[in-house]
């Protein structure tokens, strides 16, 4: 499982109003955090990636994997206006 450092593939998708932590679906399910993810997060089933909303769900996942560092350690992909993430299906466990 990935453990939340800059080089493990975790990053933020950010737009002018919100942010989502990009997480491999297999890692999310292995962590057990998938049971507590809200409908404010999104999923790309084709890529096997969940986009966990910043206010609660991202923290739920990071806690589940034992992340101790600051959440701003992750790289960001910023989009001016609305992110394409908003067009994905909402997460359901």
Regions flagged by a language model, labelled:
Residues 10-12, 21, 41-43, 53, ...:
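Generic preference for hydrophobic/aromatic residues in regular secondary structure cores
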Residues 51-93:
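Short, compact, well-ordered microdomains
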Residues 17-46:
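A short, structured beta-strand/loop element
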